[in-house]
């Protein structure tokens, strides 16, 4: 069993029940999935960028990413309907807990001048998103093998109804929020 899942069941659930007064442990919010997305604007000019991004995400998550395609054509961005404009991975279950553990304990400390995550990035429905500027902060990415520095969005989807509950959940699971 992943370390973080164990921590959730033994430490987080009792703490959340006490703080929010849940009567049943099934009411306690939990992490549902983690979605990692890389938007590829440059894929329109350089089709090889997609393969590189797929390789990066596969190394980071250990799972094959899905190509995201444009829903509509946008002349201003020179985007055709159906053109590949990004790659994403959805992690659930044990892989999700393993990724979050690695994200909190290895990846975030490697971010340059990191002062904690902004507590303002909740969406109002109990989900938290964080943007990363480069993929180099992941230990699986080899500096010599990358063609271009790419950013990505990491979204933590929880079953929490409010941002306050979601923040408490993520904080108890080790997310370093700034004050």
Swiss-Prot record:
Record's GO cellular component terms: ribonucleoprotein complex; ribosome
One Gene Ontology MF term: tRNA binding
Protein's UniProt keywords contain RNA-binding: yes
Highest taxon listed in the record's lineage: Bacteria
InterPro entries for this protein: Ribosomal_uL5 (IPR002132), Ribosomal_uL5_bac-type (IPR020930), Ribosomal_uL5_C (IPR031309), Ribosomal_uL5_CS (IPR020929), Ribosomal_uL5_dom_sf (IPR022803), Ribosomal_uL5_N (IPR031310)
Keyword list, A-Z: Ribonucleoprotein, Ribosomal protein, RNA-binding, rRNA-binding, tRNA-binding
Classification via PROSITE patterns: RIBOSOMAL_L5
Keyword Transcription (UniProt): no
A Gene Ontology BP annotation from the UniProt entry: translation
Family annotation (Pfam families): Ribosomal_L5, Ribosomal_L5_C
Subunit structure comment from the entry: Part of the 50S ribosomal subunit; part of the 5S rRNA/L5/L18/L25 subcomplex. Contacts the 5S rRNA and the P site tRNA. Forms a bridge to the 30S subunit in the 70S ribosome.
PANTHER family: 60S RIBOSOMAL PROTEIN L11-RELATED
NCBIfam families: PRK00010.1
Function noted in UniProt: This is one of the proteins that bind and probably mediate the attachment of the 5S RNA into the large ribosomal subunit, where it forms part of the central protuberance. In the 70S ribosome it contacts protein S13 of the 30S subunit (bridge B1b), connecting the 2 subunits; this bridge is implicated in subunit movement. Contacts the P site tRNA; the 5S rRNA and some of its associated proteins might help stabilize positioning of ribosome-bound tRNAs.
Family membership noted in the UniProt record: Belongs to the universal ribosomal protein uL5 family.
Official protein name in the record: Large ribosomal subunit protein uL5
Taxonomic source organism: Carboxydothermus hydrogenoformans (strain ATCC BAA-161 / DSM 6008 / Z-2901)
Gene: rplE
């Amino acid at each position: 069993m992943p370390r973080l899942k164990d921590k959730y069941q033994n430490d987080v659930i009792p703490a959340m029940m006490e703080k929010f007064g849940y009567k049943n442990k099934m009411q306690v919010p939990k992490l549902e999935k983690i979605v990692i997305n890389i938007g590829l604007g440059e894929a329109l000019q350089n089709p090889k960028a997609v393969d590189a991004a797929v390789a990066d995400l596969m190394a980071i998550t250990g799972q094959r990413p899905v190509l995201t395609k444009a829903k509509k054509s946008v002349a201003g961005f020179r985007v055709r309907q159906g053109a590949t404009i990004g790659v994403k991975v959805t992690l659930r279950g044990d892989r999700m807990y393993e990724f979050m553990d690695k994200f909190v304990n290895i990846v975030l400390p490697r971010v340059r001048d990191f002062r904690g995550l902004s507590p303002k990035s909740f969406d109002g429905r109990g989900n938290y998103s964080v943007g990363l500027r480069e993929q180099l902060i992941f230990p699986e990415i080899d500096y010599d093998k990358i063609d271009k520095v790419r950013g990505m969005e990491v979204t933590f989807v929880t079953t929490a109804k409010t941002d306050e509950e979601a923040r408490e959940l993520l904080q108890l699971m080790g997310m370093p929020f700034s004050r």
